[in-house]
Amino acid sequence: LSEAEWSSFAEEVRVLRRMGVSAISTDLWWGLVEGRQAGLFDWSYYDRLVELLARHDMHWVPILSFHQAGGNVNDDFMQTIPLWLWGKLLELHPELGSVRDLQYVSETGDTSMEYVSLWADSYVMPYYKSFISAFRDHFAGWTHLIDEVNLSLGPAGELRYPSYNAHDWGNYPNRGTLQCYSPLAEQDWRRYVKEKYQSI
C-alpha cells in the first residue's frame, strides 16, 4: 500500500472503532509472505497492519490463506500461492511426473494453479505446517490482539473443487467441470476400485 492508502485505512479503522467494532479480519496471504523461497518469510506488510490496529485498540482475526487471490467473483487483487512450490515439490519427489500431478486437472484438460490439489496433500502439508509455525512464532507477542485464527483452504478459500473457475468454461452458473483427471487423482480412483472390487 502507498502511504496515502495506509492513512486512509487508519482513518477507516478509527471510524470503525468509534462505531463499536472491536476486531477486523484480513487475509494473510501465504504467497505474499513466503513467495520468494521456502522458509524465507516477509511479514512486513502484516507487521505494519498489526501495529496500526494496536494503536487504535482494534483486534485482529487473521485468515491464513493458502490459495490464490484473483480470478474469482469480485476479486480486485491478485496474489498467487508461492510459485517456487511447484518446482520444489517436483525436485523433492521424483515420483511426480509433472506439475499436473499437483494441480486440479479438469475433464477439458485445463489445470488450476490457484490451489494445490487435495490429491497432493501429503506433499504440500509440511509447507502448510511450516508457515503456520512461522506465523505463530512471529506474532507470539501479539496474541492479546488476535481473537481467532482462520484457515482458508481450497479454491477461493472454500473447501471445494475449482469446477466453475476461469481456467475452464469460466461462466457461472454452469454445471461445472469434473476436476479428477490429474495423474494422482486417477491413481487414487484405481486404488479405490482395486480395494473395492479386487481388480480393475
Segments the model singles out, each with a brief description of its role:
Residues L1, H67, G154-A156:
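Generic structural motif
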Residues L1-S7, A120:
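Active-site mouth loops of central-metabolism enzymes
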Residues S2-E3, V33-R36, E158, S163:
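Generic alpha-helix signal with a bias toward terminal, lower-confidence helices
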Residues W6-D101, M125-T143, D147:
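Aromatic-lined substrate-binding rim segments of carbohydrate-active enzymes
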Residues G87-I200:
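Polysaccharide-binding and catalytic clefts of secreted carbohydrate-active enzymes
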